[in-house]
Every structure is written in structure tokens, then in C-alpha cells.
Amino acid sequence: MISKETIEKILQFRNDRDWEQFHNSKDLSLALSVEASELLELFLWKGNEDVSSERLKEELGDVLMYAILLAEKHQLNLDEVIQEKLTQNNQKYPVQKARGNATKYDKL
């Protein structure tokens, strides 16, 4: 779980640099996508075991921080966002149909 203290540190890092002025929804979303692509690039042409844990942590950290900044921009509670999404996923992927099956929900 990401603590309130950690989220506050992320926001303080941003505020100390006066970067909030650049953090509009579009640019935060684009930055999140860029960082997610950098995460994907770690796996490009490699097996799972060939990926550096340190690089994985670095890129995953970037993705998570931009997600937190975007949620904060829209005053979203991340715990609520995740709980709501889990509820939706439980409805889309009932255990009896989805267990051991990677098929998308609309094809189950």
C-alpha cells in the first residue's frame, strides 16, 4: 500500500520545484504513458528473467508517481479508485468463468 506520507513526499517534491504549473491532465497522462513505455522497453526482446530488478523498480516508480499525481490533480482517492475497479472486474470476470482463463470478459 502507498502510504499517505509517501504521497505527501511526492507532492512536496513537485511543489518544491514549482512543477504543478506544468502538471495538467493531458501532460500527466502523456508522461504516464511514456514511463509505462519505458517499463515495457525493459522486457523488449528479453525473457522475464533477463530484466534488472533495479531498472524495474525505477521505471515502476515513475509510472506510480505519475499515476498518483494524476489522481491528485482530479482529487481522486486511489484506494477508492482501486476498490471500485476491483468491484467492476469481479463482475466482468466471475471466478467460475475466468479461473485459469485469459480470455477477455466479453468473450467468456
Feature annotation, model-predicted:
Residues 1-60, 64-108:
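Flexible "arm" and connector segments at domain edges
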